[in-house]
């Protein structure tokens, strides 16, 4: 299969070519992010973030990623070297993609109630997106329908008083 036949997420056209290279290799391998994560001893969310330039793999990650996807490690070493830094916060605002828009909509509709509950339980502060883990699960609802369960797990950071 040539790379020209691979359907790529639109956002990849705005990123350095290494990310299209990674996505193409993932498609050819028929591996999921969960499969790759298992090979790398990482969480699938973190691995997916690497594929969009939102996280920086360390050297051990690069070795495992190149082995998992049968890629030449030197390309990854060059791309993710000392000059690489993640570009977090990709995309349009508000998002146009239906999945991303629904996540945005959740925060628009339920953001203030969530903020209020965080303040009631923890005090004045924020949930870190730096000291953070996220997980996505497929679960069954009460009518046996497929449901998406997203867990956001961030360190609480109180605002400092001075």
Swiss-Prot record:
Its EC number is 4.2.1.104. InterPro entries: Cyanase (IPR008076), Cyanate_lyase_C (IPR003712), Cyanate_lyase_C_sf (IPR036581), Lambda_DNA-bd_dom_sf (IPR010982). It is an enzyme of class 4 (lyase). The keyword Lyase applies. GO terms for biological process: cyanate metabolic process. Gene3D superfamilies: Cyanate lyase, C-terminal domain, lambda repressor-like DNA-binding domains. Catalyzes the reaction of cyanate with bicarbonate to produce ammonia and carbon dioxide. Belongs to the cyanase family. This is Cyanate hydratase. It comes from Mycosarcoma maydis. The gene is CYN1.
